UniProtKB/Swiss-Prot annotation:
GO terms for molecular function: ATP binding; histidine-tRNA ligase activity. The gene is hisS. GO terms for biological process: histidyl-tRNA aminoacylation. This is Histidine--tRNA ligase. It is found in: Cytoplasm. Keywords: Aminoacyl-tRNA synthetase, ATP-binding, Cytoplasm, Ligase, Nucleotide-binding, Protein biosynthesis.
Length: 420
């Protein structure tokens, strides 16, 4: 047994699995960048009050799942449990909302929630997110959703579905809240659930306990009580999704786990993951900017789970990314050859080729085994006789064929064989 291991619920990604992880993260990010979303890098931890106010004190995230601690200055800070609140804080702090709108940003990285670890549910989770802030336009809602859909499909994932609903606006939510509370207070709920019903009754509909879900099965749904404006907004979003060819299922009982969502709300679900079927989701948050001290601007965004997307691909028997660490592997047969190959490797790397080489006293057989394990397409075999002749052996590791190439022509030959 090793002396140290990763903390419970915190996964390591090591080769070759790490190549698939990186490919998933890159594929999801690239879909956002192609739609004009610029990269933003955020702190891993923030002032605890940012999440308490932004995410909602009645949510499980804030009340049960945050990693919160006092720093050496006795300030309460929290490892970020989600990305939107931090992005909104940065937009306000740096005045991005004073420029061209919408502000369109994308990001990726680790987020932290103290949950019971299981497949697809980690205490350190990896996400890709986008936020579009400053324009209340249903066409923008549809674009954000389409970006997520395109990201999943770019990876070859196809066994997922988009579930969507509307959580209404300020003109219809108060009346619905009263209606829902009247229904909930007529049930035989435990005291903690009744407390949540008083603070935010939608949270009760998000309860995962079977007995609570059974009791709330006939609860009124917000989709049946939308204002005219909220209904028109939702209908327009659906019309845009239809035009974009993005399939969806309307789920009137959907409740997201964060309090800031309004109007359009959505989730991507993959049934191959069992109980933890959500692979991403998001929605509109029209009051969050004002709530965090900024202008009264609307916003919409999503968070996609990199870990869960990788699990979903595996459930479909698919993989992405290459396990190969390099394109070319150097096999030196002497110390002098090692020096010359190091120079060749530098030239190839400058040309954009991934190059590794054998180190230590491996001998030819050991070095060639290392070349095979590396996943390289080409091996460069160099000995003292080759140096005297001014050549190097260029071996195709897929076919086994080998040719001698002049040292000055190696870069061009390798690029040609790699099809570049």
């Amino acid at each position: 047994m090793p002396e140290f291991s990763a903390p419970k619920g915190v996964p390591d990604y090591v080769p070759p699995d790490s190549a698939q992880f990186v490919a998933v993260r890159s594929g999801l990010l690239d879909a956002a960048r192609r739609a004009g979303y610029g990269d933003i890098e955020l702190p891993i931890f923030e002032d605890t009050a940012l999440f308490a106010r932004g995410v909602g004190e009645s949510t499980d995230v804030v009340s049960k799942e945050m990693y919160t601690f006092a720093d050496r200055g006795d300030r309460s800070v929290t490892l970020r449990p989600e990305g939107t609140a931090g992005v909104v804080r940065a937009v306000i702090e740096h005045g991005l909302d004073r420029g061209t709108l919408p502000v369109k940003l994308c990001y990726a990285g680790p987020f932290f929630r103290y949950e019971r670890p299981q497949a697809g549910r980690y205490r350190q989770l990896q996400q890709v997110g986008v936020e579009a802030i400053g324009v209340d336009d249903p066409a923008l809602d549809a674009e954000v959703i389409a970006v997520a859909d395109a990201g999943f499909r770019s990876l070859g994932l196809d066994g997922f579905r988009l579930e969507i609903t509307s959580l209404g606006d300020d003109s219809c939510r108060p009346q619905y809240r009263e209606l829902l509370q009247d229904f909930l207070f007529g049930l035989d709920l435990d005291e903690e659930t009744r407390r949540r019903a008083r603070l935010n009754p939608l949270r009760v509909l998000d309860d995962k306990r079977p007995e609570v879900r059974a009791m709330t099965a006939d609860a009124p749904v917000l989709l049946d009580h939308l204002s005219d404006a909220a209904k028109q907004h939702f209908d327009t979003v659906l019309a845009h999704l239809d035009a974009l060819g993005v399939p969806y299922v309307i789920n009137p009982r959907m409740v997201r786990g964060l309090d800031y969502y309004t109007k359009t709300t959505f989730e991507f679900v993959h049934d191959g993951l069992g109980a933890q079927s959500g692979i991403g989701g998001g929605g509109r948050y029209d009051g969050l900017m004002r709530q965090l001290g900024g202008q009264d601007l609307s916003g919409i965004g999503f968070g996609l789970g990199v870990d869960r997307t990788l699990l979903a691909l595996r459930a479909e028997g698919k993989s992405v990314g290459s396990a190969a660490r390099c394109d070319v592997f150097g096999v030196p047969l002497s110390d002098q050859a090692k020096l010359r190959l190091a120079v060749l490797a530098a030239g190839l790397r400058a040309a954009g080729v991934r190059v590794d080489m054998a180190y230590g006293a491996r001998g030819l057989k050991g070095a060639m085994r290392a070349a095979d394990r590396s996943g390289a397409r080409i091996a460069l075999v160099l000995g003292d006789r080759d140096i005297d002749a001014g050549t190097v052996g260029v071996k195709d590791l897929q076919t086994g064929s080998q040719v001698s190439v002049e040292l000055d022509s190696v870069v061009a030959e390798v690029l040609s064989q790699l099809g570049r």
